[in-house]
Amino acid sequence: MKHLRITYAIVCLAWLTCACQDNTKFHQYQPVKQTGWHSIDTLTFHLPSKMDSGEYDMQIGIRHTEKYAYQDIWLEMTCTCDSTMFAKDTLHLYLATKNGEWSGRGIGGLIQSIHAQAKPLPLQPTEQGYIIRITHLMNDSTLQGIHDIGVQLSPRH
């Protein structure tokens, strides 16, 4: 009976370990200048050149302070390979509810929200790698309160 309990515990532990595995292939944040995020400032993410081909689920992370004056943010995301643009998207992300409460969580005055994108990002093998560029499309030419922007890619199942 004791042997059965130990076997059961090992199987449960192995299952939990597999269930908690993170299959993220790329996860990086780029800081925004302390003077604000200017509309001409582009955040650049260089993906590893040896990423497996296939479709990737993408999440955009935004870290901001309460100084950010808007409930949402408009971003333009482009993905290039060998200086050829093959993906471009406009992202409309909500950072606060209609009541003005921040959607994300945080500590120390920094709020983080994660936004899953509906469209997968298709990648093929390449020697040079891919570059993702993100700029903001807000009417305000300089945004205050945005701390950094992140990109996370995981293989789509």
Segments the model singles out, each with a brief description of its role:
Residues 42, 91-95, 103-119:
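A beta-strand/beta-hairpin structural motif
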Residues 124-140, 145-155:
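Internal, hydrophobic beta-strand segments that form the core of beta-sheet-rich folds
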Residues 69-75, 145-147:
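Short coil-to-beta strand junction motifs in C2/discoidin
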Residues 16-19:
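C-terminal motif of bacterial Sec signal peptides marking the signal peptidase cleavage site
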Residues 60-67:
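Short amphipathic, basic-aromatic surface patches that mediate peripheral association
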Residues 28-50:
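Post-signal peptide N-terminal segment of mature Sec-exported envelope proteins
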Residues 1-8:
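Bacterial N-terminal signal peptides that target proteins for export
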